[in-house]
Every structure is written in C-alpha cells, then in structure tokens.
Regions:
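Short aromatic-glycine-enriched beta-strand elements
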Residues: 37-41, 148-153
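Residue-level signal for tight coil/turn positions that link beta-strands
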Residues: 35-36, 146-147, 170
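Short beta-strand-centered aromatic/proline hotspots
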Residues: 25-33, 136-144
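Short conserved catalytic/interaction loops centered on acidic-Pro-aromatic/His motifs
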Residues: 137-140, 150-153, 161
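N-terminal beta-strand/beta-hairpin edge segment
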Residues: 30-47
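Short glycine-rich, low-complexity segments
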Residues: 1-26, 45-51, 55-134, 156-199
Length: 199
C-alpha cells in the first residue's frame, strides 16, 4: 500500500481507498502526503466537491486503486464542479496548505497534526475506527488532549439534550476527518442547540 500511495502522491492521481472489512464501500480523493503510519487525503464526494481532509491509518486500509472507470467518471464530475464553481466551497485547498506547513515543522504524525489543528481552532471532526464498537463513527469536538488519548464530546443528533463525552485513545482511531460537509453540518447543530459547550 505504501508504494501505491507514493505513486498516487507523485502522479496526483484520483484514487479509490478501501478500508479493511469493506469490499464495496470506498472513499475517493487525492493522496497528499504519508508518514510512517498515516496518510492524508483530500476527499471528494459523489458530486465532485472537495469534502474535507481525511487522515487514514495505513494499517486499516485494504487497498488503494487508481485508473478505474468510476474514477474516470468522477474526473468528469470534478471538472463540472470546477467549471460551475462548487468544487471547493469550504476553501479546503487553503486549509490543506496551512496544515502541510504545520506538518513540515513538527515531529507529530499526520493524525496528531490534524487533531491538534481541530482542537486549537475549535473545529468539529469526525472519528472512526475501533472506538467502543468496531466501526463506530463520532462527530464532535475535542474537549481536551492528553498524551495517549483525547476527551471527545460527540453530538447525538437524535438526543440534542445529551452531552456525551468519551475518552478515545489515539491507537483506536483509524480515520479522522474535518472541514467536510458532515463536520460543517454538525458545527451548525452545535452552534444552534449547544452554543455553551462550544468555542
């Protein structure tokens, strides 16, 4: 996988990224950078829009594929999004450049760099992996950082009065994303219904 990722970075290829245990579900995006354990991807949604930055744990990935018919179709959809002006509605490319500058000045992993960015700027992130039950995904914000874990406040869209908080070890996180449609939607919910918890 490391070689496939290196090739995708070098050629700026659009790729399909499959996580272990999911044969049919995959993410689409541009591989930006990798370190020993993690890879940073600029995600693209089915409408051809940039949909946040995602850090994947490489050990959780099954395969990375480029040059499929689906990706050729996606390239056309991305071209339309660029032409019509909705490719990068959240200024993801600007954020990515800032994140890369920080990453180049630090000894932290890509995962910790993304988590620190989210924590210091009070940004909602989405985390998934082996948290509580395998495959669970949580959107919320980091309450506090510790050496081996974070205290994470997540949003339960079905019970807005709840204020669930869980401790998540860095080792449990297989995927972390922010600056996406989902995280911006969750931010709007937090600001509307729990403004005292946030900022």
């Amino acid at each position: 996988i490391r070689d496939d990722l290196a090739k995708a970075i070098k050629n700026t290829n659009l790729v399909e990224i499959y996580s272990k245990g999911t044969n049919e579900q995959f993410s689409v995006g541009y591989v930006i950078q990798q370190d020993e354990k993690f890879v940073l991807v600029q995600a693209v949604n089915v409408d051809g829009e940039l949909d946040g930055l995602v850090v994947f744990r490489k050990a959780s990935l099954a395969r990375v594929i480029s040059d499929t018919d689906y990706l050729k179709s996606m390239a056309t959809i991305i071209a339309l999004a660029k032409q019509r002006g909705y490719y990068d509605v959240w200024n993801t490319e600007r954020l990515m450049n800032k994140l890369l500058k920080k990453q180049n000045k630090t000894k932290h992993s890509l995962l910790k760099t993304l988590l620190k960015q989210a924590f210091h700027h009070d940004q909602v992130i989405q985390l998934s992996g082996r948290i509580k039950k395998h495959g669970d995904s949580y959107a919320g914000f980091i309450h506090s950082e510790h050496k081996k874990y974070i205290e994470f406040n997540y949003v339960d869209m079905f019970d807005l009065a709840k204020r669930p908080q869980i401790a998540i070890r860095y080792a449990e996180i297989d995927e972390a994303s922010f600056h996406s449609f989902e995280t911006f939607n969750t931010t709007a919910v937090i600001e509307s219904f729990m403004p005292g918890d946030f900022h």
